[in-house]
């Protein structure tokens, strides 16, 4: 299904689920998916070009998402995504991609929206065997664990506070 073909009702449900506490992981071209754009509130546009060598640097070794990785890992062939990436400033940037053609990209970005956690991970072009790389698999596994809900609500409300702060 093409990004634009996702019904708005589905986007509404995904957004509400994240705001209520569901974790969400967006891979590669999901940066242009309707749910990601809705959750980011921007176009999520970026620069790109055909496959080149990428070195992915761990810029936050304390993050649970980067546990078990070295200083960097390499992807022999990956679609280049380059800045400017039109997203809000991440709450936490954990991975930075550098390409042999000189571009850099915010490759692993963490966000909090409402009660939910979001992780965007850039690698994964369909014409490249990226998901067979052990470090890429580890990032995704770690991200799934990181995104597990810590707190969930059943509905999104804005209740009136019925009790006074203090008695007179």
Model-derived segments and spans:
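Mature, folded catalytic cores of secreted/periplasmic enzymes
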Residues: 10-14, 70, 74-78, 138, ...
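Active-site-proximal beta-strand/loop segments in catalytic clefts of secreted hydrolases
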Residues: 1-2, 27-30, 98, 121-125
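Extracellular ligand-binding/catalytic regions of CAZymes and related secreted enzymes
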Residues: 105, 113-168
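Catalytic beta-strand/loop cores that center a nucleophilic Ser/Cys/Thr
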Residues: 45-120
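Secondary-structure transition/capping residues
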Residues: 25, 47, 76, 151-155
């Amino acid at each position: 299904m093409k990004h634009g073909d996702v019904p708005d009702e589905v986007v509404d449900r995904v957004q509400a689920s994240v705001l209520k506490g569901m974790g969400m992981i967006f891979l590669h071209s999901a940066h242009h998916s309707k749910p990601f754009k809705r959750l980011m509130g921007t176009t999520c546009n970026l620069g790109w070009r055909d496959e080149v060598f990428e070195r992915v640097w761990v810029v936050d070794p304390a993050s649970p998402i980067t546990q078990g990785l070295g200083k960097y890992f390499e992807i022999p062939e990956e679609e280049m995504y380059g800045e400017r990436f039109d997203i809000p400033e991440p709450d936490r940037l954990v991975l930075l991609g550098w390409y042999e053609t000189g571009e850099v990209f915010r490759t692993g970005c963490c966000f909090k929206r409402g009660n939910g956690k979001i992780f965007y991970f850039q690698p994964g072009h369909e014409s490249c065997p990226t998901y067979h790389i052990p470090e890429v698999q580890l990032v995704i596994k770690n991200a799934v664990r990181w995104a597990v809900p810590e707190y969930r609500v059943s509905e999104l409300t804005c209740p009136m506070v019925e009790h006074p702060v203090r008695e007179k």
